[in-house]
Amino acid sequence: MAANVLIMAGGTGGHVFPALACAREFQTRGYAVHWLGTPRGIENELVPAAGLPLHLIQVSGLRGKGLASLIKAPLQLVRSLFQARRIIRELRPVCVLGLGGYVTGPGGLAAKLAGVPLVIHEQNAVAGTANRSLVPLASRVCEAFPDTFSSSAKRRTTGNPVREELFLETPRDSLAHRRPRLLVLGGSLGAEPLNKLLPAALAQVPAELRPEVFHQAGKQHAEITEQRYAEAGVEAEVAPFIKDMARAYAWADLVICRAGALTVCELAAAGLPSFLVPLPHAIDDHQTRNAEYLANEGAAVLLPQAKTDAAALAAQLTEVMMQPEKLKAMGTTARRLARPDATRSVVDICLEVAHG
């Protein structure tokens, strides 16, 4: 019978997609993967679709919640801890891997109490509350970006696990005989500030320099975004969401998007230059730190939302459209910063502590 591994990740795709990459790697090595999540996260959709058994505990975040939630917090933590401990006792995993989300707090503590090796992985350049609290309990601490955690014998810089198909091997065709292609990404829900900004900015780019545009606007905003482009006199293809991200990245020459950890690492994997507009109200401003990983090396342009209006973005776009060699150089730098071995490294570390 295959040995069990328990993965803890939930809430958003930024936690769940890297965890799914690790799950597939564990499976290729002959391990049975189980998943610990919460009832309200995106894992409820994605994990069963991947054919993985999903175990749920009742836990939610406290940051920014009211007094009533804070009063209930100790009881909720105790309840979720007992739920997680029961699941771990039943599964008897050789290792528990936590990749973020509220589930990792009680799940990680339960692993420690059960004597099961715990490995945590932080996707962002600024560690989340749950992962910070688990550092003393973990056997190994993996980070996507250098120096997210304080230096210690536990720390390993692995990069972010991303889908293998994003590591493009074939070079993009030359820009000598076609217009550059601009991909705008707003995430699964869309980014309304980008939906408003891009049509206005592209209208100010000279027509002869204007790129082809594919804009992912989110389900609720696709129609109004398409209308904005039409009113601005800018030709663009607008979609609510993108199913095949590998194909979209392969099509693009430049990406404008937020700076979520997974997105930043996918851009590096795809060797794509980018304009990054960090979410202004992200916890601990972690998206700015994520963006700096690429921007400080010249692989991206960091555009703070509060300081970026249509005219400023139009000027930036006009400049790079006139310099295709700059786009190519930025993409080459992005590829150099990629970590194609990230998934294997994280799984290697888990099995090292499990069997070491």
Swiss-Prot record:
A biological process from GO: cell wall organization
The reply to whether Protease figures as a keyword in the UniProt entry is no
Provide a Gene Ontology MF annotation, just one. Answer: undecaprenyldiphospho-muramoylpentapeptide beta-N-acetylglucosaminyltransferase activity
Per the record's keyword annotation, is Nucleus included, yes or no? Answer: no
Q: Which residues does the annotation say bind UDP-N-acetyl-alpha-D-glucosamine?
A: T12, G13, G14, N124, R163, S188, I242, A261, L262, T263, V264, C265, E266, Q287
Fetch the SUPFAM superfamilies from UniProt.
UDP-Glycosyltransferase/glycogen phosphorylase (SSF53756)
Give the family per the record. Belongs to the glycosyltransferase 28 family. MurG subfamily.
Q: A GO CC term?
A: plasma membrane
Q: In which pathway does it act?
A: Cell wall biogenesis; peptidoglycan biosynthesis
Record's function text:
Cell wall formation. Catalyzes the transfer of a GlcNAc subunit on undecaprenyl-pyrophosphoryl-MurNAc-pentapeptide (lipid intermediate I) to form undecaprenyl-pyrophosphoryl-MurNAc-(pentapeptide)GlcNAc (lipid intermediate II).
* Localisation per UniProt entry: Cell inner membrane
Give the matching PANTHER family.
GLYCOSYLTRANSFERASE, UDP-N-ACETYLGLUCOSAMINE--N-ACETYLMURAMYL-(PENTAPEPTIDE) PYROPHOSPHORYL-UNDECAPRENOL N-ACETYLGLUCOSAMINE TRANSFERASE 1
Q: Gene encoding it?
A: murG
Tell me one Pfam family matched here.
Glyco_tran_28_C
Principal localization? Answer: membrane
| Gene3D superfamilies linked to this entry | Glycogen Phosphorylase B (3.40.50.2000)
Q: Which UniProt keywords apply?
A: Cell cycle, Cell division, Cell inner membrane, Cell membrane, Cell shape, Cell wall biogenesis/degradation, Glycosyltransferase, Membrane, Peptidoglycan synthesis, Transferase
- Return the protein name: UDP-N-acetylglucosamine--N-acetylmuramyl-(pentapeptide) pyrophosphoryl-undecaprenol N-acetylglucosamine transferase
Membrane topology classification? Peripheral membrane protein
Q: Which EC class heads this enzyme's classification?
A: transferase
Q: Which organism is it from?
A: Stutzerimonas stutzeri (strain A1501) (Pseudomonas stutzeri)
Q: What is its EC number?
A: 2.4.1.227
Q: Which domain of life is it from?
A: Bacteria
Catalysed reaction per UniProt?
di-trans,octa-cis-undecaprenyl diphospho-N-acetyl-alpha-D-muramoyl-L-alanyl-D-glutamyl-meso-2,6-diaminopimeloyl-D-alanyl-D-alanine + UDP-N-acetyl-alpha-D-glucosamine = di-trans,octa-cis-undecaprenyl diphospho-[N-acetyl-alpha-D-glucosaminyl-(1->4)]-N-acetyl-alpha-D-muramoyl-L-alanyl-D-glutamyl-meso-2,6-diaminopimeloyl-D-alanyl-D-alanine + UDP + H(+)
